[in-house]
């Protein structure tokens, strides 16, 4: 739950970076960026492409149920944890397709092989600067800049990462570019310059606030 970070200080720093975010920060003050497992985050964001949130959740649940271990919760209810690299590496592409991941099945296989072989690991990524880490992640089939930035932010603790999807592009254009169509790369560069190491936090406040308020 990212309890080691002082969110009071983080919120003050985000507002200091841009006073226009005060309302967003105040209204969405409970937002936290969770410290999530790298491998699960990688696969989940590969699955997320062109899917709705309910569909993504169902696919991840299907993968966990098919390949993960059963765990009994405190109330006696059974659930399944996300499988480790070995378990998913042993899965066939056809078995993955049965989890309703569609065209993403070969991407999941490629990502799993990259992690299993040691070509792309959390340890390697942690040693690189953010640009190098993004480039290494994008050697995995199906991982573009947006997915790579999401993995950096949510699965590797790189809080300076600023993922830009269709929604975030629209939000940033309206708030900072007078509504003009702007390239995602230019938006990301602007965010890096404006928010620095706070980029991921600013992105989360902006994303949640704007989706429920501006549109």
Question: Where do the protein language model's features map onto the residues?
Answer:
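HhH-family (HhH-GPD) DNA N-glycosylase catalytic core used in base-excision repair
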Residues: 1-215
């Amino acid at each position: 739950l990212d309890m080691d970070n002082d969110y009071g200080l983080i919120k003050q720093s985000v507002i200091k970076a841009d006073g226009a975010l005060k309302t967003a920060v105040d209204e969405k003050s409970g937002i936290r960026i969770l410290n999530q497992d790298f491998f699960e985050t990688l696969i989940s964001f590969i699955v997320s492409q062109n899917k709705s949130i309910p569909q993504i959740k169902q696919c991840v649940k299907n993968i966990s149920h098919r390949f993960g271990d059963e765990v009994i919760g405190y109330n006696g209810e059974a659930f399944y944890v996300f499988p480790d690299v070995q378990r998913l590496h042993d899965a066939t592409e056809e078995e993955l397709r049965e989890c309703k991941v569609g065209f993403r099945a070969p991407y999941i296989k490629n990502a799993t092989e990259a992690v299993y072989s040691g070509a792309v690991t959390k340890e390697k990524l942690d040693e690189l600067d953010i640009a190098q880490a993004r480039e290494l992640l994008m050697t995995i089939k199906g991982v573009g800049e947006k997915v790579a930035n999401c993995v950096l932010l949510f699965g590797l603790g790189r809080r300076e990462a600023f993922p830009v999807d269709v929604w975030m592009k629209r939000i940033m254009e309206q708030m900072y570019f007078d509504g003009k169509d702007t390239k995602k790369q230019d938006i990301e560069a602007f965010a890096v310059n404006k928010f620095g190491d706070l980029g991921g936090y600013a992105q989360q406040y902006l994303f949640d606030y704007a989706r429920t308020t501006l549109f």
